[in-house]
Amino acid sequence: MSAGTSATGPRRGPPGLEEATSKKKQKDRANQESKDGDPRRVSMPRKEPTKDELLLDWRQSSDKVVVKLRVGTGPICLEEVDAAFTDTDCVVRLPDGRQWGGVFFAKIQSSCTKVQTRKGGLLQLALPKKVPLLTWPSLLKKPLGTQELVPGLRCQENGQELSPIALEPGSEPRRAKQEARNQKRAQGRGEVGSGASPGAQAGPSAKRAVHLCRGPEGEGSMDGPGPQGDAPSFLSDSATQVEAEEQLHVPPVNPQTSLLGSEKNLALLTVEKTVSPRSDSVSPVMIRNRDPEKDDHFKEEMAVGADPAALADEPESMVNLAFVKNDSYEKGPDSVVVHVYVKESRRDTSRVLFREQDFTLIFQTRDGNFLRLHPGCGPHTIFRWQVKLRNLIEPEQCTFCFTASRIDICLRKRQSQRWGGLEAPATRVGGAKVAVPTGPTPLDSTPPGGGPLPLTGQEEARAVEKEKPKARSEDSGLDGVVARTPLEHVTPKPEPHLASPKPTCMVPPMPHSPVSGDSVEEDEEEEKKVCLPGFTGLVNLGNTCFMNSVIQSLSNTRELRDFFHDRSFEAEINYNNPLGTGGRLAIGFAVLLRALWKGTHQAFQPSKLKAIVASKASQFTGYAQHDAQEFMAFLLDGLHEDLNRIQNKPYTETVDSDGRPDEVVAEEAWQRHKMRNDSFIVDLFQGQYKSKLVCPVCAKVSITFDPFLYLPVPLPQKQKVLPIYYFAREPHSKPIKFLVSVSKENSSASEVLESLSQSVHVKPESLRLAEVIKNRFHRVFLPSHSLDAVSPTDVLLCFELLSPELAKERVVVLEVQQRPQVPSIPISKCAACQRKQQSEDEKLKRCTRCYRVGYCNQFCQKTHWPDHKGLCRPENIGYPFLVSVPASRLTYARLAQLLEGYARYSVSVFQPPFQPGRMALESQSPGCTTLLSTSSLEAGDSEREPIQPSELQLVTPVAEGDTGAHRMWPPADRGPVPSTSGISSEMLASGPMEGCSLLAGERVSRPEAAVPGYQHSRESVSAHTPQFFIYKIDASSREQRLEDKGDTPLELGDDCSLALVWRNNERLQEFVLVASKELECAEDPGSAGEAARAGHFTLDQCLNLFTRPEVLAPEEAWYCPQCKQHREASKQLLLWRLPNVLIVQLKRFSFRSFIWRDKINDLVEFPVRNLDLSKFCIGQKEEQLPSYDLYAVINHYGGMIGGHYTACARLPSDRSSQRSDVGWRLFDDSTVTTVDESQVVTRYAYVLFYRRRNSPVERPPRAAHAEHHPDLGPAAEAAASQASRIWQELEAEEEMVPEGPGPLGPWGPQDWVGPPPRGPTTSDEGCLRYFVLGTVAALVALVLNVFYPLVSQSRWR
């Protein structure tokens, strides 16, 4: 450049003066570098390389170029090799001074280049092609000019020497005399210098070939010829002005301070092209403001032919700013808006310069607050801030404008895609990570890796086609301006070290992100990973295990992971949705997901995501415990609102069936739901169920279809094991004892009947369940009756009955009870006066109804009758039973066979030998037998007392209303009158009664004769005296003895029952001894482990409970449109449409009331493979069954007061849910370990994640979403700006997370009630307060759950 500047541009001075100035600056530079402690660059003798010292060989593939340099025979230290890459060229400098570089044939991806060492003294350069599948005919472009060649800068391509690269002479830029002062100033405000300073050197345009230059000292002043022999000129007419905009300017370079020898200056120099020799200066070309209302012109006035010494003493300099307060957001898919907050900026001297990869803001300001931040600067100081952009822009379409408080810059994207941030991320140079500073780099330099992010093949192809017609305008737009900035020879100020975020690591290739396999493998080899991808844990921030388990489970949802990994979600962010977070939640979740799958952290801290969630849901503020399912529902709902494709939600109404087909109503309801809710979350997680309501009064049926995000399936309540004794229809089969598990609450008899039905292979309609108390039927259960009051100690009998459909006629069902004819209970004292029996002559008289008490006389009996009246009833023996006989075959013989067959299992009967002289009672009246009542004989009662005639106190019973449901013996309303003769006067007056006589020798045959279709002859049945009598008890509780009518069927109604009375009276001939015994039965082998399985359920049982009809509670009453009133209707939920990812919540937590809260820890057995839901889904009849495979489980340990969450998950393959790309792992906060699949099913499972087989989620094309992104309003712009800042902050903080192990294990103090040990905003006082409050809450809950129920129960007793 010239030594002076004018109002229109820089001008050249006399050749002699400039040469002297150049030598003076060289001397000053050497002195300064010696003071800075870098004598190597000054004192090391220069070694002139020859062309044979570097041997070049190169090869190419479809997506990259590999260059090999033979630099010697010894080992190479990669840290001493200086390498600089741009998209078009490169420079490699060796420690001994040799260098190689040039302009490539085509563009490369400078951000992905690598420098590696190989055996044999080889240096290998890996250069990814920017346009894959493009074949390079040569490595380097053929130079256009024929300038002097730099010794040693010669290359060979495939063994053949290439033409040398053209160079240009240059000269050392001058330094200002205030260098020391500027260096001190730079410590407070960043880098200071001009276009030729070490921190801001001229660089090539992204479209211009670069030529290396290096000349001897004193050679190449600015008066020397240019590349085409033209001297610089000052342009006067408009035609030459346009040409001047197309020219490139090259400042002279010194060999010791040029790009080739500086580690900080990694950019290449641009080629200067001048137009006309008519003038010795060149006018700068500026980019005008695109705003027609605010068209600012930057004017520079510099004296023509000014003294160079005066320039050196210039008081002001251009200050390169490292940071300016700003924010940015993406306005739609095509533009980015940047707000730079600088007040009182001077419009006449401020402007913005745009290039396709960056922009530079040059301004002056009068703001005192801003100037105080930069000591030594004033209103005339020129500030410069440059931003390297993340992707390419259209410089011609970018605009800017000035306001009183800020500068607004609008960038037009070249490609319509989301950037995810403003500045370009970090990159690598020479195989090592290099962080690109967030501060500016010079406009005329291109730092390595500062180019746009690598594009996919399709995007790159579109970018190449779009770049071709604009090559001329882009090449000539800014490059001429870069070299003509004022004060470019001012002394540079060193830039302080800036703490920059580390670059993000490359993630494994996603299905929707075609990345080169070779480059990915090389990146994985170079990357220093601390764990395998997918084995990164999450730090427990303090009781945040509920959040960690949910995030880890969702991160293993294959479709969701890929959707956020390849950044497809960016095109669907809805900034206008007031129900969302403006994209902040989606971006935060995406960054967290990427960190979990990079493998660069042992544990990651999800504090940013928690803060975003807490800003939207205040219940998650702080570090209290929460429900994992509640957090999961909020997170998925928040992601849905952030990604909702609907910008303006229309009003919709609930769709009712009104008699229409379910298929039509369901589809209409789903489409209406999609009119307001359409996102990737809906496509992946949401299903649809059918809700059916039935009014109990008018039978109005209402059917609606509603969406669901997860299925909250209830668990059966705590189980109880009930012993059930099953009696087959025929008595020859021994009873079988079954153990059946039912719920302690809300259980019904139908559960038992269905369970037994599956065991005995009998229809539930043919079974009857009855409860037995004190050897009599207490009640017979209908299928709908509740079993809540039944305890495991109660006796339950189940009987198989003959169905009328099978018999094809009326079937008579009879209840049968057993009792002895005469009880054998000794009596020692009077029940009324408590006087003991004195002698045999004064025996106590028994009560003839119950035979359980005795009296001295009738007076004592009448006195005691009020107390004895309620207890006066006979007691049965054995077990009662039910018999079912067809009406046409109900003969006395058949009935006797059935009764004796059933009775022998519960009573012991023994007939003693016949004793001559025993009194026969056949001649007595029937009243002696029909009115006798006995008490039950205790099993094992050896003390027996002979019954004398005087002890038989008989009375005539008077019927009384039966107060019991199954009362077999009515109490008398008046007391019996004792008689010393043993026979009352009423019986004597009654005379002979019918039915008393019995046939001699009558005996019942064996029960085996009761087989259907087999009938014994009457002679065989009547061969012996019967052991019992049969009495019929009618509805009025009156008894009548049945008579044997031969083959004539007995006439018995359905409202009567039977009593089997054993002949145990010792005064009768052939009496029997009878006593109760334990029921003879066989044990069911399948019930052996029922007690152990009492706390085990299956997922099918839970789904059955979910789909079972239930009656609404009064507070949930449904408004019937037909009755016009709220009704406690019957509600039933049925699955209609199943999602691709099914989430099932096991409702382990029971909230019956504020006091009664409980957690069910019983095991729920759920399938890991092949969950078939075809029997639960009534809609969408498809060819393939809805089969699901488990891929994640959230576990909860502990109870209601405190607990801990963990997760088990695997990453299913993208093609088949049965296979896994990453196997099962256990996520316990920051600890991640592998587990076997058999260890996944535990009693602590809380939330289950299933993936459907053979049902991929189709993503809509990105172009289809263009209509969902109209121009954003002010509120949406603010949300987009904040979301963009969060994306940058999260990416920056992603690499600064502590990698050590997290908190304590699963039972550590952080997972229980208490404050976090290291909360970011929690002080020691706050921790103590949280601990005290948590302890008090735990004590209150303990009192309410334990002591209050005890007090309340004792009160009601």
Swiss-Prot record:
The protein's enzyme class: hydrolase
Record's subcellular location: Endoplasmic reticulum membrane
GO biological process: ERAD pathway; negative regulation of proteasomal protein catabolic process; negative regulation of skeletal muscle tissue development; positive regulation of cell cycle process; protein deubiquitination; protein K48-linked deubiquitination; protein stabilization; regulation of cellular response to hypoxia
Comp. bias (Basic and acidic residues): 28-52, 171-182, 459-475, 1259-1271
Domain of life: Eukaryota
Start and end residues, zinc fingers (MYND-type): 830-872
Location of Phosphoserine modifications: 221, 283
USP domain span: 536-1253
Known outcome of mutating residue 545 to A: Has a destabilizing effect on RNF123
Keywords noted in UniProt: Endoplasmic reticulum, Hydrolase, Membrane, Metal-binding, Phosphoprotein, Protease, Repeat, Thiol protease, Transmembrane, Transmembrane helix, Ubl conjugation pathway, Zinc, Zinc-finger
Transmembrane segments annotated in the record for this chain: 1331-1351
The protein's Enzyme Commission number: 3.4.19.12
Positions in the Lumenal compartment: 1352-1357
Record-listed Zn(2+) 1 binding positions: 830, 833, 856, 860
Pfam families reported for this sequence: CS, UCH, USP19_linker, zf-MYND
Active site, renumbered: 545 (nucleophile), 1204 (proton acceptor)
Residue ranges with Low complexity bias: 194-206, 437-457
Residues given in the record as Zn(2+) 2 binding sites: 847, 850, 868, 872
Renumbered residue ranges of the record's region Disordered: 1-52, 162-239, 275-296, 432-479, 962-981, 1259-1278, 1292-1320
Catalytic reactions on record: Thiol-dependent hydrolysis of ester, thioester, amide, peptide and isopeptide bonds formed by the C-terminal Gly of ubiquitin (a 76-residue protein attached to proteins as an intracellular targeting signal)
Induction description: By streptozotocin and fasting in skeletal muscle.
GO CC terms in record: cytosol; endoplasmic reticulum membrane
Purpose: Deubiquitinating enzyme that regulates the degradation of various proteins by removing ubiquitin moieties, thereby preventing their proteasomal degradation. Stabilizes RNF123, which promotes CDKN1B degradation and contributes to cell proliferation. Decreases the levels of ubiquitinated proteins during skeletal muscle formation and acts to repress myogenesis. Modulates transcription of major myofibrillar proteins. Also involved in turnover of endoplasmic-reticulum-associated degradation (ERAD) substrates.
PANTHER family the record matches: UBIQUITIN CARBOXYL-TERMINAL HYDROLASE, UBIQUITIN CARBOXYL-TERMINAL HYDROLASE 19
Description of how the protein assembles with itself and partners: Interacts with RNF123. Interacts with BIRC2/c-IAP1, BIRC3/c-IAP2 and XIAP/BIRC4. Interacts with HIF1A (via N-terminus).
Protein's recorded name: Ubiquitin carboxyl-terminal hydrolase 19
Natural source organism: Rattus norvegicus
Organism ancestry: Eukaryota, Metazoa, Chordata, Craniata, Vertebrata
